[in-house]
Amino acid sequence: MGELPLDINIQEPRWDQSTFLGRARHFFTVTDPRNLLLSGAQLEASRNIVQNYRAGVVTPGITEDQLWRAKYVYDSAFHPDTGEKVVLIGRMSAQVPMNMTITGCMLTFYRKTPTVVFWQWVNQSFNAIVNYSNRSGDTPITVRQLGTAYVSATTGAVATALGLKSLTKHLPPLVGRFVPFAAVAAANCINIPLMRQRELQVGIPVADEAGQRLGYSVTAAKQGIFQVVISRICMAIPAMAIPPLIMDTLEKKDFLKRRPWLGAPLQVGLVGFCLVFATPLCCALFPQKSSIHISNLEPELRAQIHEQNPSVEVVYYNKGL
């Protein structure tokens, strides 16, 4: 078997990102929880393979599939801009097991005020860790911005949960089960824009098809943040809407009435099953490398691009996650 060529572009995902299927395959790989079980030595081995290949050195005997596997293992554990190893629960591969546990508990312990407050706080604490761990190298999150977003999102989530909880007291019990979802949706609408407030102030980089940076756009930032908010809310819908319907039916049956202790693990399991599919599929709703027509950009930036490169009609930007 001959040595691998050096023209495999491991800077980009393996599958075509212009199609939903290609994006879904990419995110199923990125969010694979099995990556959490890899040892430090395995992570370092993957980092060496990737860094050597980018430097023009092919690891002897490696196949193309092994190269791509190393690339995805590397991406799952190391920050793309800083190269630092991301804390375990901040990695994309931790999304399913962590959200499974937290969401399952939010849906199980929704009746009493102290448990509502506690699990909404846990959820926003986890979100803060994920957002900080995956912060952008272009627009890094300051401690103050992180704190503001964290406190605001937690306050918004708790206020929404407690407000709706009081409003649903006289409604059918099933309605009360959806209060945690409303709280999470409200928190996402607060947390993500605040966490990325610098992008809303100075814009995010936009580039031509070849990757040549053309400037910064606040309009592109708004579009990207909106897409991320929609993705995050859609991601929560299956896990926070389907299990309550199933549990409401099961809790009326003798099986769970005789074994109430099974309620929490069963709910967590149902949430996990939904998240295994919802997380990658909702991450794939919009292309990571999104596009916007220059006619929709700010007038100054549009004029600047026309002056630099009159043939450019569409620019691209990284929408974030």
Curated annotation (Swiss-Prot):
Origin superkingdom: Eukaryota
According to UniProt, the reaction catalysed is: L-serine(in) = L-serine(out)
PTM sites of type N-acetylmethionine = M1
Q: Which residues form the signal peptide?
A: none
Please identify the protein, giving its name as recorded.
Answer: Sideroflexin-3
**Has keyword Acetylation?**
yes
> What membrane topology does the UniProt entry give?
Multi-pass membrane protein
Q: Which PANTHER family match?
A: SIDEROFLEXIN (PTHR11153), SIDEROFLEXIN-3 (PTHR11153:SF20)
What's the stated role of this polypeptide? Mitochondrial serine transporter that mediates transport of serine into mitochondria, an important step of the one-carbon metabolism pathway. Mitochondrial serine is converted to glycine and formate, which then exits to the cytosol where it is used to generate the charged folates that serve as one-carbon donors.
Q: Where in the cell is it found?
A: Mitochondrion membrane
Does this entry carry the keyword Transmembrane helix? yes
Family per record? Belongs to the sideroflexin family.
**In the record, what terms sit under GO molecular function?**
L-serine transmembrane transporter activity; monoatomic ion transmembrane transporter activity; transmembrane transporter activity
- Tell me a GO biological process for this protein: one-carbon metabolic process
Species annotation:
Homo sapiens (Human)
What GO cellular component is one of the record's annotations?
A: mitochondrial inner membrane
**Listed transmembrane segments:** 146-164, 174-194, 226-246, 266-286
- Tell me which UniProt keywords the record has, alphabetically: Acetylation, Amino-acid transport, Membrane, Mitochondrion, One-carbon metabolism, Transmembrane, Transmembrane helix, Transport
